[in-house]
Amino acid sequence: MERIPSAQPPPACLPKAPGLEHGDLPGMYPAHMYQVYKSRRGIKRSEDSKETYKLPHRLIEKKRRDRINECIAQLKDLLPEHLKLTTLGHLEKAVVLELTLKHVKALTNLIDQQQQKIIALQSGLQAGELSGRNVETGQEMFCSGFQTCAREVLQYLAKHENTRDLKSSQLVTHLHRVVSELLQGGTSRKSSDPAPKVMDFKEKPSSPAKGSEGPGKNCVPVIQRTFAHSSGEQSGSDTDTDSGYGGESEKGDLRSEQLCFKSDHGRRFTMGERIGAIKQESEEPPTKKNRMQLSDDEGHFTSSDLISSPFLGPHPHQPPFCLPFYLIPPSATAYLPMLEKCWYPTSVPVLYPGLNASAAALSSFMNPDKISAPLLMPQRLPSPLPAHPSVDSSVLLQALKPIPPLNLETKD
């Protein structure tokens, strides 16, 4: 049987084979095992690094969610109440975000509108500056509007002053009509502007009329009464005198006064001119009144007026009946010096409430010669001087001489 050399051990003569080393045993090589161990450690290290990465990522995500929740809570607090009431129950995060978006859009639209208005105003101001209008002109126009309104209101109220059923709606309607006329540029208001002037003229004659009563009463009624009595109503007796009323106080006696009145009746035109000149001289009443003032109605009395007069009956609240001076007889002229010093503000009372208003009394009253002196003496005015019933008419003329005439030329 043949030997298989590979199976047989080597011969002895052959060199000794080196010994086995650790590197000759691949299965038992520690480097291989080291490499295997080393790979496991790398795997562990990679797993640890992944775990360490996941831990901060979780923290970051948690913080991010916390910030989102905090912002949503603040938006929920900042939302208007009318938006919160649109939803019922608890507001979810998505609902809060939707409401916030809606509110922001509304605010954006409002801001855009305001911006457009601001731009329009700026463009208008620039156009106004280019046209030449300034602030002062605007202020004047503003004030003139109020003044025009106040003037129209005053004119309307003055025009309808006597109207009792005046309503505010009528005034407002009038103001609207005036505004429409002003806007249309109508010139019809120019014709209505003189309306207050006409009303002023209507109101003004009342005050000058009062002022002209003084000179009118001083001049006109005296001449008219003198002419009326000189035309034929005088009885021709010594009692029909004017006592210096018509500027005839410088005559010699009572006869000459009557003749002068008759002669003056012939030249009434010239006397009328003089009276007109006196009236036009000054419309204000004189500061000092030296004569009693009687109107035309007080100078003429008829028997029917005297009978129907309420002054003849006794009444405590009515003034006594008064007579002018030219009806006083010479026997009662003793009281004229007293009347010269303290003039009574009205006519001298000669009849009293206790006097019987009968026809006989009136007939005797119209004939002053038959009336006794004590009946004509005023009881309400105590006499500071003693009575002289026997004084002649010359004493009366002497007492009336210092009184200046009423700016009338006397006949030479």
Curated annotation (Swiss-Prot):
<feature type="modified residue" description="Phosphoserine">
    <location>
        <position position="383"/>
    </location>
</feature>
<feature type="region of interest" description="Essential for interaction with BMAL1, E-box binding and repressor activity against the CLOCK-BMAL1 heterodimer">
    <location>
        <begin position="1"/>
        <end position="139"/>
    </location>
</feature>
<dbReference type="GO" id="GO:0005737">
    <property type="term" value="C:cytoplasm"/>
</dbReference>
<feature type="domain" description="bHLH">
    <location>
        <begin position="52"/>
        <end position="107"/>
    </location>
</feature>
<keyword id="KW-0832">Ubl conjugation</keyword>
<dbReference type="Pfam" id="PF00010">
    <property type="entry name" value="HLH"/>
</dbReference>
<feature type="region of interest" description="Disordered">
    <location>
        <begin position="275"/>
        <end position="309"/>
    </location>
</feature>
<keyword id="KW-1017">Isopeptide bond</keyword>
<keyword id="KW-0238">DNA-binding</keyword>
<dbReference type="InterPro" id="IPR050370">
    <property type="entry name" value="HES_HEY"/>
</dbReference>
<protein>
    <recommendedName>
        <fullName>Class E basic helix-loop-helix protein 40</fullName>
    </recommendedName>
</protein>
<feature type="compositionally biased region" description="Basic and acidic residues">
    <location>
        <begin position="248"/>
        <end position="259"/>
    </location>
</feature>
<dbReference type="InterPro" id="IPR003650">
    <property type="entry name" value="Orange_dom"/>
</dbReference>
<dbReference type="Pfam" id="PF07527">
    <property type="entry name" value="Hairy_orange"/>
</dbReference>
<keyword id="KW-0539">Nucleus</keyword>
<comment type="function">
    <text>Transcriptional repressor involved in the regulation of the circadian rhythm by negatively regulating the activity of the clock genes and clock-controlled genes. Acts as the negative limb of a novel autoregulatory feedback loop (DEC loop) which differs from the one formed by the PER and CRY transcriptional repressors (PER/CRY loop). Both these loops are interlocked as it represses the expression of PER1/2 and in turn is repressed by PER1/2 and CRY1/2.</text>
</comment>
<keyword id="KW-0597">Phosphoprotein</keyword>
<dbReference type="InterPro" id="IPR036638">
    <property type="entry name" value="HLH_DNA-bd_sf"/>
</dbReference>
<dbReference type="GO" id="GO:0032922">
    <property type="term" value="P:circadian regulation of gene expression"/>
</dbReference>
<keyword id="KW-0090">Biological rhythms</keyword>
<dbReference type="GO" id="GO:0007623">
    <property type="term" value="P:circadian rhythm"/>
</dbReference>
<keyword id="KW-0678">Repressor</keyword>
<feature type="domain" description="Orange">
    <location>
        <begin position="142"/>
        <end position="175"/>
    </location>
</feature>
<feature type="cross-link" description="Glycyl lysine isopeptide (Lys-Gly) (interchain with G-Cter in SUMO2)">
    <location>
        <position position="288"/>
    </location>
</feature>
<feature type="modified residue" description="Phosphoserine">
    <location>
        <position position="235"/>
    </location>
</feature>
<dbReference type="GO" id="GO:0070888">
    <property type="term" value="F:E-box binding"/>
</dbReference>
<comment type="subunit">
    <text>Homodimer. Heterodimer with BHLHE41/DEC2. Interacts with TCF3/E47. Interacts with ubiquitin-conjugating enzyme UBE2I/UBC9. Interacts with HDAC1, SUMO1, RXRA and BMAL1.</text>
</comment>
<dbReference type="GO" id="GO:0046983">
    <property type="term" value="F:protein dimerization activity"/>
</dbReference>
<dbReference type="InterPro" id="IPR011598">
    <property type="entry name" value="bHLH_dom"/>
</dbReference>
<feature type="cross-link" description="Glycyl lysine isopeptide (Lys-Gly) (interchain with G-Cter in SUMO1, SUMO2 and SUMO3); alternate">
    <location>
        <position position="279"/>
    </location>
</feature>
<dbReference type="GO" id="GO:0042752">
    <property type="term" value="P:regulation of circadian rhythm"/>
</dbReference>
<feature type="region of interest" description="Disordered">
    <location>
        <begin position="183"/>
        <end position="259"/>
    </location>
</feature>
<feature type="cross-link" description="Glycyl lysine isopeptide (Lys-Gly) (interchain with G-Cter in SUMO2)">
    <location>
        <position position="167"/>
    </location>
</feature>
<dbReference type="GO" id="GO:0001227">
    <property type="term" value="F:DNA-binding transcription repressor activity, RNA polymerase II-specific"/>
</dbReference>
<keyword id="KW-0805">Transcription regulation</keyword>
<dbReference type="GO" id="GO:0045892">
    <property type="term" value="P:negative regulation of DNA-templated transcription"/>
</dbReference>
<keyword id="KW-0804">Transcription</keyword>
<feature type="region of interest" description="Necessary for interaction with RXRA and repressor activity against RXRA">
    <location>
        <begin position="75"/>
        <end position="79"/>
    </location>
</feature>
<feature type="cross-link" description="Glycyl lysine isopeptide (Lys-Gly) (interchain with G-Cter in SUMO1); alternate">
    <location>
        <position position="279"/>
    </location>
</feature>
<feature type="cross-link" description="Glycyl lysine isopeptide (Lys-Gly) (interchain with G-Cter in SUMO2); alternate">
    <location>
        <position position="279"/>
    </location>
</feature>
<keyword id="KW-0963">Cytoplasm</keyword>
<feature type="cross-link" description="Glycyl lysine isopeptide (Lys-Gly) (interchain with G-Cter in SUMO1, SUMO2 and SUMO3)">
    <location>
        <position position="159"/>
    </location>
</feature>
